[in-house]
């Protein structure tokens, strides 16, 4: 792994059912450098989301290696550090929203990380403003549009201030 690499995949292979011959990800190798913007394009069902879930160890490769700043995603002791460094916004925001009020949802991960209250308030407000959801901060997420829910999910990850942000079609549901 090069000094400025934040993510590296080497010959990653993954299949959801090891009894089946077809791989969802088959031999992918790539590097993402710090500060770089990368888009992975492909047809529906080609493995883009599956690959993305490898970068914060939601999925682990059947073979090959995924490194986050030289930390192997298969190393249990590094899982916490990896997930702090790589934030992910899922394609469907309902899979990510856990609280009953928008600002509580944005603060959820920060509470789990033990971020001090004053800093948490600043991060939550800044993230909600950046994601364009600040005006909805006291609303229930289930009463928001799909695009607004996506903004809540984006704000929650931004508030964590990860070194790398993975967006799995995160703008697909956004309102104009």
Please provide the spans of the model-predicted regions.
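The feature captures the beta-strand-to-loop junction immediately N-terminal to the Walker
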Residues: 41-43
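Helix-to-loop junction immediately C-terminal to a conserved catalytic motif
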Residues: 56
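Conserved ABC transporter NBD signature motif
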Residues: 64-74, 82
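Conserved ABC ATPase "signature" region
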Residues: 118-136
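Conserved ABC ATPase signature
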Residues: 140-144, 148
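Conserved catalytic motifs of ABC-family nucleotide-binding domains
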Residues: 161
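Catalytic Walker B motif of ABC-type/P-loop ATPase nucleotide-binding domains
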Residues: 165-168
